[in-house]
UniProtKB/Swiss-Prot annotation:
This is Altered inheritance of mitochondria protein 9, mitochondrial. It is found in: Mitochondrion. Keywords: Mitochondrion, Transit peptide. It comes from the Eukaryota. GO terms for cellular component: mitochondrion. Residues 1-41 form a transit peptide. InterPro entries: Kinase-like_dom_sf (IPR011009), Mito_inheritance_9 (IPR051035). Its main location: mitochondrion. Belongs to the AIM9 family.
Amino acid sequence: MLSRVVRQRSRSAISSFKLRAHAAFAETRIGVGISVQATRLQSTKLSANPEEIYTKISDSADPKRNQFFQYTWGSWLENDKLKKSHRETRFSIEGVSNLVQELNLTRKDPANVDSSGEPLLQIKPVQQLKDGSFVLTNNLSNKLIGEAQDKDAKLLVKSIASIHEGKDLVLRIPYKLESDYSISQKIKSEVATLDFLSLKLGLNVPKVVAYGDNRSNALQTPFILMEYIEGDLLMKKWNPLAADSEETDASLKSVIQPISDFQDKILSVNFNKFGSLYFHDDVSVLDQADVPYDGEENPLLVNRWRIGPSIERQFAKNKNHLSEKIVKEFNGPWKADAPLSLITSVASIELENAKNRLGLAQADSASKVEDVEVLKKQIETFEHLQAIGSKLFNSKSKSIMNVEELFRPKLFVPDLDPLNVIESNDKSYFIDFEYSTIKPFILTSYPNFVAYHGAKVYNLEEDIPGFTEMDEVEKQQYEFMYYKTRNERLWELELNSRRHDLIAVASPHVKVLKSPYLQALELKTDKDYLYVEGAIVQLQAMWDAYVANELCGSSSSEFPVQYTEEFLDRHQTDLEEYQIETVSSPFAATGGWIPQDMFETLKEQGIIVETENGNYKVEAEKALEEEPEEK
């Protein structure tokens, strides 16, 4: 049987590129329907001249279908081919068809239908299919996977399309950026978290139909098959740099409020441990003994979820060279009375990772060229974070309002963002729960779309002397700072109106104390350790005051890290050089990644050129040339 492969021009916006470029999953829409004769594949390759390619559906080795599996959202200035190869998302097309058939058979199982033959949709334990996949039978509704009019008809794949053109289900496949262990844990936890949010809290999230946490399934890859939500991204309404007006205020709040509402609902549950959510059978026997939260009255939910190891990003990202055994030493779960263990655990795994990389580099066994001096400085920094981590906070401090509530285990979703919210039928659906974890609210960060770490400007004319006399370029710099301050403030006001008992997280002193930990969670390049060290250095000047006010977990005014003048001078020099390097290097903020349409345009213009070693560079002089005036 022949299938048509269509390469169609992508219609995504730049904001979509941002979402996909840094996600650890690729998404493909799967259309299901009554037995059909063809499967359509569509790539997301940006092309002004779409072309049709034919391939045999049973020929998994056909090179013509490669384009569909390849990463096409963007390109990198360095190691482009290698980074794209890590993001290929191959799966068995036949396997998808077989899985859908299995789902249909499972739905028709007498144990899963009522007397009229309709799906029961009752809450049942996760069921494993014969191919190794898992299915949530309570989500096998006709609405989600389609309905066969003839009871003997087969429910088969109708189409396989890109993220932009499908209709019914979304197939999520992880990029090969993390270890098999990390990917497995991440999938199991994300599915359980979605299940919890849907069944326990009744929130608007996609329903998971089936999943596989490893390659032992019909698709031959880890995957999540879930509900497709039709609608528009909330991001379309977000205009963060709009000038102040009643209309702007209403517009900004129309984006912030639904996200704040969602956070408020997930904060309603106090958990019994720190870690991440899993289904009961996916954690150790020891962890199965502890219920995740108290007071569950629904017998169908009492033993549905448990708390296991954390899948927070830092326990998986760039940890490929650490064995599963070593990772398990650091990723929890942790008891509720040991909240600062989360900080020391992050410091410890980063320290272990840096030592491991240094050892491989010195033995000439590293898989890439390493900067040995940078790795040595990383080790020093994470030793400092390890030393200060358990002393950053006093979890019983009387100087922090409602301190006990702030340190209770709460569910934290790191990707609460209008890019991950779909508006559909007057409802807001939240779609991304990767790396969700249970941690103290005081150790969480604000959503990226409102977070601002720069100097605060609350009133341009009062806070900035001579603002009205400045030229337009200088004014714009301060206006940017003002708008970012305003947006973060709006988020804090929404938090205060819903959870006044948690508003102490807005304290500047709390932000300074947790900054070393949050900086460690935001590592994107090897030199970002400089920001971690900088946050620790900043604490030194305030340490006496924090000890005196019992804010930190130390009774000694002696700073836990002993710095020499030589070290501080070297750190300041390294930090300034790195900041200059970042500012002067195009696309440094994205790690050299460029959206594909922009990449191709700049390449055509001669601004991006390929070098002899296969990398690319930006011709700064070419970029600064003025465009010729049109005649």
